[in-house]
Curated annotation (Swiss-Prot):
A GO cellular-component term linked to this record: nucleolus
Cell compartments where the protein resides: Nucleus, Nucleolus
GO annotation (BP), single: maturation of 5.8S rRNA
Protein family according to the UniProt entry: Belongs to the MAK16 family.
UniProt keyword annotations, A-Z: Acetylation, Isopeptide bond, Nucleus, Phosphoprotein, Ubl conjugation
Residues that span the membrane, as ranges: none
Descriptive protein name: Protein MAK16 homolog
Region (Disordered) location: 191-278
Chain intervals with Basic residues compositional bias: 263-278
Superkingdom in the source lineage: Eukaryota
Crosslink position(s): Glycyl lysine isopeptide (Lys-Gly) (interchain with G-Cter in SUMO2): K55, K151
Modified residues (Phosphoserine): S197, S200, S229, S232
Organism from which the protein derives: Homo sapiens
Amino acid sequence: MQSDDVIWDTLGNKQFCSFKIRTKTQSFCRNEYSLTGLCNRSSCPLANSQYATIKEEKGQCYLYMKVIERAAFPRRLWERVRLSKNYEKALEQIDENLIYWPRFIRHKCKQRFTKITQYLIRIRKLTLKRQRKLVPLSKKVERREKRREEKALIAAQLDNAIEKELLERLKQDTYGDIYNFPIHAFDKALEQQEAESDSSDTEEKDDDDDDEEDVGKREFVEDGEVDESDISDFEDMDKLDASSDEDQDGKSSSEEEEEKALSAKHKGKMPLRGPLQRKRAYVEIEYEQETEPVAKAKTT
């Protein structure tokens, strides 16, 4: 039979308790079912056969109750009741389940439930709040990011310098008043361009008309207008033709002599000694030029 006074005298005063922690001023209890965390007679979960406490598991609160009737069954020693997430309903559940428990235990259970609810709300707020997260980076990635930042900074400085320089040039009229170009001067330039294009078109039309007028007209040209260089070219061409004819005649005569020698050899006659004499063909070319005085007709 269980006796709470005997257990407390044994654990609390004389012998050793594995859940007890002593300090200079006070003793604490490390048992997971401890209601207040203090080591005293009313808060000890081992020395009280009728006991209750509140525990939190994965964001959900549970009410644990112990009675003396289940002391002989350690497997069924604690009864667990799930509490509502609504604070008022949870307090009502505590009152309903702890009707026959001491008032001290009922009050401490409500106090413990209130503290657990407060830190759960605090946890939810912190999770929803934006927080800094430290991410470890390798040295290689860190160097790469640093180089990229330096290049981006240089590019930004260069763009700013270019923009500043362009603004200064614009203020100093370096580009010759590009944006404030006078309209009358622009119109004058357009008129000059149109006049030049019209004059060029008229000249082309006049040339075309002259060409059309010259069609069908006859002109007589004097014989003396032929250049001497053209005549010399014609003479050179005639000489080339004559030399080619001579070569062809010489080749034909040599072929005939060779054929005669071969035929004589077949007939049993001795071939002629010595080199064969080739005959050269002489060609005489005469040029006749007739000059007649012709009056040149000039048209106006």
